[in-house]
């Protein structure tokens, strides 16, 4: 028996060394309707339980709002029994997740850095180095530290003139949300090269702290091994790695005993053993706190669902400026809709689902950055986290338009100078 365990461990190590990728053949995604509190409780419990193997692409929130669940083949019978025993109704949304993964990237991409495919961690870092060298008059390389696996967390400060107020963009804190990082690099390029007068105005009237990948370990792992990896890669448990960095911030953090996060290290919403236990979040917070006089807006980029959320996620209590945050969000959503008709919904975060220890609750509640928003990019669920690369540019275009609307309305209401 001991020999078997040793040999199995060696095989696993060799598999990781040669870059064997996890496959998701015949993994299915179902949309499950939630009609009563008993059904909702089962889904909450299922999301938080150890080794459940179910991946909630759209989380349980409240009665009347459906969830999306990825079900592995070996759980198909169990899933069917859960659906039957509690009279759930469900529909098959994605019959084979691996097919979407195989089709996510173009078959014959052009050479050079462009926005026709999703780029690896190394390629993004190389591109950041290149554009800093090419635009050293307005770009400064910045870093807020190192990840658990000693990956430098690199970004840029874009500044056309001294004294500008600043906007901070945090992206790819959830590593499987590839569209977030691709959109962020596109925005950097547009801020540098666009001749559109509205883009030029927001690029040059504000300083921009931009970090395309704030969870580099997870992002690298999502390319090399497990496309659906969400968390960091830290070790707090013998069997399961990582914590959800967007449940790990130290404002109203909770240990996972409530509905806003999990205390199970194997859960995708594991809050970590303590606030800021993750290097990626603690160092980010320190970076922001050192610049709170400068940073006037904080944006957190995610996917999917086509939403724009503002604080709070941990409580139903409204921010004192909730009406303005809603109005600014609606102005952003209206501008976003114009290029392609994409309809974003604007919410207080808690009205969608309870999420404790998230970044925008911390920036608003602890760092005092009133204009704190989280985007959930395309799509509405057809592809989920596996948005085809041919949607990178359309998504980026509409997000840029939303930033124009958001900044214009924030200025009009007196929240930006």
Model-derived regions: residue spans:
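M14 metallocarboxypeptidase catalytic domain recognition
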Residues: 2-7, 13-417
């Amino acid at each position: 028996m001991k020999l078997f365990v040793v040999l199995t461990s060696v095989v696993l190590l060799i598999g990781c060394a040669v870059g064997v990728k996890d496959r998701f053949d015949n993994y299915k995604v179902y949309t499950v309707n939630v009609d009563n509190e008993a059904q909702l409780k089962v889904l909450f419990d299922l999301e938080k339980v150890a080794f459940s193997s179910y991946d909630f692409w759209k989380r349980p929130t409240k009665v009347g709002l459906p969830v999306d669940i990825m079900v592995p083949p070996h759980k198909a019978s169990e899933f069917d029994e859960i659906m039957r025993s509690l009279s759930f109704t469900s529909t098959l949304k994605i019959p084979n997740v691996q097919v979407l993964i195989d089709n996510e990237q173009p078959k014959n991409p052009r050479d050079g850095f462009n926005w026709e495919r999703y780029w690896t961690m190394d390629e993004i870092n190389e591109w950041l180095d290149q554009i800093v060298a090419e635009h050293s008059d307005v770009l400064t390389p910045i870093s807020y530290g190192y990840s658990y696996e000693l990956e430098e967390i690199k970004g840029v400060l874009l500044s056309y003139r001294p004294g500008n107020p600043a906007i901070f963009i945090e992206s790819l804190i959830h590593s499987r949300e590839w569209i977030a990082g691709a959109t962020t690099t596109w925005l950097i390029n547009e801020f540098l090269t666009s001749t559109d007068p509205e883009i030029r105005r927001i690029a040059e009237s504000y300083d921009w702290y931009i970090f395309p990948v704030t969870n580099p370990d997870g992002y690298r792992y999502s390319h090399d091994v497990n496309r659906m990896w969400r968390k960091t890669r830290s070790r707090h448990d013998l069997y399961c790695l990582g914590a959800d960095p967007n449940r790990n911030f130290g404002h109203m953090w909770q240990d996972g005993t409530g509905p806003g996060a999990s205390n199970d290290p194997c859960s995708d919403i594991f809050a970590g053993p303590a606030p800021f236990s993750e290097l990626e979040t603690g160092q980010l917070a320190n970076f922001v706190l050192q610049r709170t006089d400068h940073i006037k807006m904080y944006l957190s980029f995610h996917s999917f669902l086509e939403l724009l959320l503002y604080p709070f996620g941990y409580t139903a209590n409204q921010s004192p400026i909730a009406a303005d945050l809603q109005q600014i969000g609606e102005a952003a959503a209206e501008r976003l809709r114009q290029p392609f008709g994409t309809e974003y919904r604007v919410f207080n975060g808690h009205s969608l689902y309870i999420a404790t220890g998230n970044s925008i609750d911390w920036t608003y509640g602890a760092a005092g950055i009133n204009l704190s928003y989280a985007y959930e990019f395309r799509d509405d669920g057809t592809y989920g986290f596996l948005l085809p690369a041919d949607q990178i540019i359309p998504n980026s275009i509409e997000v840029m338009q939303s930033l124009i609307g958001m900044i214009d309305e924030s200025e009009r209401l007196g929240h930006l100078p």
